[in-house]
Amino acid sequence: PLFDPDQMAAAQPKRRRAGTVKKPVIPERDIQRVILQALALHPLVERIERINVMAGRLLGKDGVSASRFMRSCRKGRVDLDGFTTDGRVIAIEVKRPETRNKLTPEQQEYLDQVRRAGGLAGVATCYDEAAAIVEGRI
């Protein structure tokens, strides 16, 4: 034969059983974008912004050697940060619905610190949950 049957079988895409449908997964960044845009219009929100937590090494002048490790902010920082019209801090960690309860210990500690200081903090998987956090209902 021209092609090995075992290799041909391995190269074929995996097929689903008839009648099954793959559940769509909405990326967290899309949920963040929707919440961010909607909260920007909320009457109690003075300012809200997305926080980028980045980490990496600075390269030396030769482009190869790493001179030092840099982090843009500390571990556990929330996804959305801002403040209300009356000056209270807003800290919202955005999660996909299926990973709602999967906070890192650092994220949980940050949310707890904001709450202890009198801020509004919580985990949101949609705009309604984020609005409830801002309005103090959660």
Question: How should these model regions be labeled?
Answer:
Residues P1-I138:
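Catalytic phosphate/metal-binding cores of nucleic-acid and nucleotide-processing enzymes, i.e., regions
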